Amino acid sequence: MPAFSPRVVAILPRLCPSTWINIVKPLVALHEAGRVRAWITLESMASPRDIGKADLVVFCRNVRPDRAELLRTAIASGVPVLYDLDDNFFELPPDSASGRAFAQPEQLAMLTEYLTAASLVRVYSRPLLASAGRLNSHVEMVAGAVDLHQVRQPAKLPGGPVKLIYATSRLDDSLGRIFLPALRRLMDEEGPRVEAHFWGPRPPAELPAVRHHGVVHNYDRFLRRFSAAGFEIGLAPLADDVFHRSKTNTKFREYGACGIAGIYSDVEVYSDCVRHGETGLLVANDAEAWYRALRQLVDDANLRKKIQQQARLEIENHYSQEIFESVFLRQIEQLVGRVRPQRIIETHAVDARLRQPRLARLVRLIPQGIGCLRRKGWARCWNALRWIGSSSWSMACLQWRLRKGWNES
């Protein structure tokens, strides 16, 4: 390892695609390359003692007011903070499923505190750059990444159907309605020549021929399976409002990396990165425009192949994991500097406030579980439990990988 490798602690609300892509993947790679010493934990497990060992603390999508002491301890002790945000929670409807998780008044107040106090705020879209910039002068917009090492070559059979894919981790999905009339029309006309797949949300009842793939909670495993499936055309609808314009271009990165010709809503998330007719097709959010784009890519195999190749090249040149890691390392070095700070952090009182007795935590979970059952039903709650189990296992494996380098003096 170099003479000084910054000690970076990432405190995450949970493991999800955003935290995995933006924080876990690059930090683990930098740790294993000896450029930093990283420790990754969940905010429900974190302690100010973790901050006492850090030269930099990284948060991502954290909004829980009951864990505010973690941020406040870092600020009070002079440890720089990087806050990563790829969704505009200020624009979420508070009565939506995501709004109940991220956009209640107390959560938005906590988000404001994070954004105001951070040494650097990292965002992925121009609307979020403007929104965060009103609270903090140190905001940087970066391009997201995709790990091309996880992409597999599909075994494509000549003469088979053209495989279409719509993929999202949202189980309560409304964006698919944008293209559904066009897809239904195409499938009625083409029959077995077209094979449509939904990955994540279940397809609507009016499209019984659509094949369904369940959510894969481990993102690397998802990318391997997704890329190996041999999809040729990908659908990426997006609403034209402030919340959705604040998102990152994950679908372009995934489709491009996997050699899929994408059809994208013509909103700035995609129009800023997609070259129409070269790396994808940009379409208005109406049924006729989506139908024409679908028809064009199904009928024109040469255009389809050209877009697949050009999109893959675009991802390799601008969105690779290695590029993102170099940006992250630059940010770490700028925030930490070359001299490790010396400080004493009093953590005992804060630890006592944060760490509830195990029985108290279990009792607090009971009404939350009952409320989840009432709102979502058994199937959705079971899926949530599977997600928790998968995340717990993934976190344990991560910490095992990081432990040796982290514990070195």
List each language-model region with its residue ranges:
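N-terminal pre-catalytic "stem/leader" segment of glycosyltransferase-like enzymes
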Residues: M1-R67, R401
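Membrane-proximal helix-turn-helix segments that form the acceptor-binding/catalytic region
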Residues: T73, F89, A101-L120
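Nucleotide-sugar-dependent
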Residues: E91, S174, Y219-A257, I263-V274
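Conserved acidic donor-binding segment of nucleotide-sugar-dependent glycosyltransferases
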Residues: V274-G277, L281-A287, Q296-N302
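A short, well-ordered alpha-helix in the C-terminal region of glycosyltransferases
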Residues: Q296, L303-H318
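C-terminal amphipathic helix plus adjacent low-complexity
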Residues: E316-N317, Q321-E408
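Donor nucleotide-sugar binding/catalytic pocket of nucleotide-sugar-dependent glycosyltransferases
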Residues: T116-R152
